Structure formats: structure tokens, C-alpha cells
Amino acid sequence: MKKLLCALLCVFLLSAALPVLCEDPEEELSMDEIVEAVDLDAPEAGEWTFPVALEDLNPDFVRLANKHYLLEKDYYTKPLVKVKALKLKNGENTNGGVRKASGGTMELQQDCYEALVALSDAAREDGYNLYLKSAYRSWQTQNTMYKNRLKKNNGKDDGWVSKAGASDHQTGLGCDVIPKSWLKASGMNSKMAKEPECIWMAEHCQEYGFIIRYPADKEEMTEINYEPWHLRYVGIPAATYIMENGLCLEEFNDELQAAIQEYLENGGDRSKVEKLIQVPNGEYKGKTSF
């Protein structure tokens, strides 16, 4: 409404002033020509124009972790929730648990865990059993895994294990979810994408706030091989936008940071976006005007 009123005021002022400003005083512009001169799509001062509303963007949920945006050793210090092994009675989930690929302790952020339970329950109702293979990993654990992978590959990073600080798992929002047929497999690879469970996850994960973190056609951007099993919780609004537009989290972050910069340049309140700002701190440090 404010934008419309401003536009109408501009039209009124232009209609009064333009006859005077014209090179030929007798030449008057039509109303259509005057309206064309007014940019109705120009953002208002301090207006947030990104497709996902500010109130729907949780800084923790959309935090990017890769080798250019490294997490600190103590990045997440809030209590994590221990994953419960699913207990069923008459087909109903009686303890708010999920199927686990192993008996070890696994932890996630609360919102992510609740969403994973909901997603797993929905999959089971559709005839698919999902198993959580891996959840939160500390910086130290990831560092050990990365070094072991390098040793196995003669010092070469083959794109299967992230370096410490670059792993989604350190956020407490990354989940490796696999079908039963892969429980005894010695490793995981992109062939898993053909499994009905993974096809179901790719089609429905955004409904529960998850994205496929490392898509098949985005390896150059993520610098990680395609992982159809790796879900990342970002919240339903962000997940819907990312999946519907075929983005990876890196592309989403690029768009988000550009929107933040535009918002601030137009007089936006910095305190509203401060925690969403991310600056490269890893192998490549790009320019930023934040």
C-alpha cells in the first residue's frame, strides 16, 4: 500500500512537472508515458526483497559449512538431543525415535531431530524404511576422519570426506540417511540414488525442512561428490525455495548474501540481518563490503 501511494504521488508530481521540463513546452506526455517513468518495482528504503522472509531465516539453520566457510572448533555449544532407537507398537512410533543403522550414540539439534522423526514416520507410512547412519560430528572427530581418508588415498582429497570445520555434520543439522539394503555395505556411493527410499527422500525432504545437501549436478560448487543420502536441515521455507529452484546451499548462500547487501545499501536495519551475514574464512577469501 505504501509503495502504491508513493507511486501515485510520483505520478501526480511528474504529471505536473513534465510539461514544464519538456524541450517542447507544447508537447505533453500521456499518462501511460508518465507511469512508465515510475519504477513500481524499485524496493522501498529498508525493504527485504529476498524470496524467503527474514522471520523464516534462522541463522543456525542456513549456516554454510564448507572449506571456504569453516566452522570454529567450538561452533555449536548448545545441548544436542540424543537420537532414540525407534519403538513401534501396532505400527505407531511410541517413543519419538528413528531407525538407527548402528547402536552407537548419535545427536542432532532439537529442530532437526523432530523434523527427521516426522520425515521418517511419513516415509514408513508410504512403505519406506529409513535408517540414520550418521548425525552430529565434532570438529575433532571430523579432523581424524579427514586425515585417515588422506592416508588411504596417498594424501589426495577425493571429495568423500570434508576437512575439519567444513563438515555439515558439525552443525548438528546434517544427517546421513540410508535404505535398509545398504546397511551392510562397506561404503556409500552415488548408486544409492536409484534406491526407492532415496528417490522418496529427494521428492519429499523439503516438506520437513530438509534439502539434499550435495546434489548430483552441483559438484563443482559444493566440491563434494553427489551424496543422495545426505540431508541437511534448513527449515521448511528455505528448504522449499532451495529444492523448488534446484539450488545447492552454496548458491542459496550467494543469493542470500547479495540480498543482505542490497537490503543494507537501501537503509535496512543491520541488527535484523547481522547473524545471517557470512564471510569466507577458508581457502578462498572473496571480497565483501559488509
Where are each of the predicted segments found?
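Intrinsic low-complexity, intrinsically disordered segments enriched in polar/basic residues
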Residues: 2-3, 204
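Sec-dependent N-terminal signal peptides of Gram-positive bacterial secreted proteins and lipoproteins
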Residues: 3-22
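Extracytoplasmic cell-surface/polysaccharide-interacting catalytic and binding patches
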Residues: 22-135, 139-290
